[in-house]
Swiss-Prot record:
One of its GO terms (cellular component) is plasma membrane. It holds the Pfam family NIL. Part of the ABC transporter complex MetNIQ involved in methionine import. Responsible for energy coupling to the transport system. It is a peripheral membrane protein. ATP binds at residues 19-26. The keyword rRNA processing does not apply. The gene is metN. Keywords: Amino-acid transport, ATP-binding, Cell inner membrane, Cell membrane, Membrane, Nucleotide-binding, Translocase, Transport. This is Methionine import ATP-binding protein MetN. The keyword Transmembrane does not apply. Residues 1-222 form the ABC transporter domain. Its main location: membrane. It comes from Wolinella succinogenes (strain ATCC 29543 / DSM 1740 / CCUG 13145 / JCM 31913 / LMG 7466 / NCTC 11488 / FDC 602W) (Vibrio succinogenes). The complex is composed of two ATP-binding proteins (MetN), two transmembrane proteins (MetI) and a solute-binding protein (MetQ). Belongs to the ABC transporter superfamily. Methionine importer (TC 3.A.1.24) family.
Length: 303
């Protein structure tokens, strides 16, 4: 059951719904296309109040939202072409339009040579590519992904993530994905919402969520810290705007300040490699160190 969920998904982004099993991720995802209802509150999708839709209006609304699942849901007795063409046939598109769209989508997902193959002859990654092509046939503006990579091996997972990124960048499709894999979120998503027990733990920009986690997020991510008891411990965060600047060495030289490095980490977020660092300085030098950090553009906090 979901409770007190309030978030906004920016158009044209890749947005992650993240949490452990039973957190409510898939339930929240399915409210976006009306597969799951809700008792209180409101949900607006692309300017439409979902609660106001029913019958044919809801059916037409769902044309604008594609969806892919963990287990592909392909028809075993139909070849790849017919699996992708299914939504178009249901909506009675002309045959010429069906041919054009299906072959364009098979080219997009890298399966143009597999149009006559049947699902039993495909790998797991290829089956998911067919499912993605099928989800895009009606040219949706939103693509929902419910644990679409969790049944795949690491190499297949990466290929599907690359494909979702291509779809987002080239077609401008908003991708909302459910996952429990933190590496997927870091590599692919622009924003994310973390759920726990049906409640929203935190949401926002990926860099801020992972590089500057609050105590609840640190507990969720399983991070623990062992810090020196003497001196002052300061955590520094290096967003991409200042990630290449030699801030630490500049501080040491300009302030003639000796400090020790407690720990640090580097992580890849999309195309950027960003990090955080914890340093320990003498308590007597805290004030001047803080003044320097304030002017440096780096984010920081005293632990």
């Amino acid at each position: 059951m979901l409770d007190q969920i309030s978030l906004e998904i920016p158009k044209g982004t890749i947005y992650g719904l993240v949490g452990h099993s039973g957190a409510g991720k898939s339930t929240l995802l399915r409210t976006i296309n009306g597969l799951e209802g809700f008792d209180e509150g409101e949900l607006w999708v692309d300017g439409v109040d979902l609660q106001s839709l029913q019958g044919d209006a809801l059916r037409v609304f769902r044309k604008n939202i594609g969806m892919i699942f963990q287990h592909f849901s392909l028809m075993a007795r139909q070849n790849v072409f017919e699996n992708v063409a299914l939504p178009l046939r249901c909506w009675k598109y002309p045959e010429a339009e069906i041919q054009k769209r299906v072959f364009n989508l098979l080219s997009l997902v890298g399966l143009e040579s597999k149009s006559d193959s049947y699902p039993s002859a495909l790998s797991g990654g290829q089956k998911q590519r067919v499912a993605i092509a099928r989800a895009l046939t009606l040219e949706p503006q939103i693509l929902l992904s419910d644990e679409a990579t969790s049944a795949l091996d690491p190499s297949m997972t990466q290929s599907i993530l690359d494909l979702l990124q291509t779809i987002n960048q080239e077609l401008g499709v908003t991708v909302v994905l459910v996952t429990h894999e933190m590496e997927v979120v870091k590599k692919l998503c622009h924003h994310a919402a973390f759920l726990e027990g049906g409640k929203l733990l935190r949401s926002g920009n990926i860099e801020e969520l992972f590089l500057q986690p609050d105590p609840k997020m640190r507990h969720f991510l399983g991070e623990s810290e062992v810090l020196p008891k003497e001196g002052v411990n300061i955590r520094l965060y290096f967003p991409k705007e200042v990630a290449q600047n030699p801030i630490i060495t500049q501080m040491a030289r300009q302030l003639s300040l000796d400090f020790s490095i407690v720990w640090g980490k580097l992580e890849r977020f999309g195309e950027d490699v960003l990090g955080s660092l914890v340093i320990n300085i003498p308590e007597a030098r805290q004030e001047e160190a803080e003044r320097f950090l304030e002017s440096s553009g780096v984010r920081w906090e005293v632990l």
